[in-house]
From Swiss-Prot:
Residues 25-44 are annotated as: Disordered. The gene is rpmH. The lineage of its organism: Bacteria, Pseudomonadati, Campylobacterota, Epsilonproteobacteria, Nautiliales. InterPro entries: Ribosomal_bL34, Ribosomal_bL34_CS. Keywords: Ribonucleoprotein, Ribosomal protein. This is Large ribosomal subunit protein bL34.
Length: 44
């Protein structure tokens, strides 16, 4: 049986990266929430 997680850096950046987050309103919400929380890493 094939596992669901097949790591791939390009896809990782494209779907969860900073620029991807900034593209949508909700993504910006995520970044701001993480800023408020004081996360060391805002995005992948």
């Amino acid at each position: 049986m094939k596992r669901t997680y097949q790591p791939h850096n390009t896809r990782r950046k494209r779907t969860h990266g900073f620029r991807a987050r900034m593209k949508t309103k909700n993504g910006r919400k995520v970044i701001n929430a993480r800023r408020r929380k004081g996360r060391k890493r805002l995005a992948v």
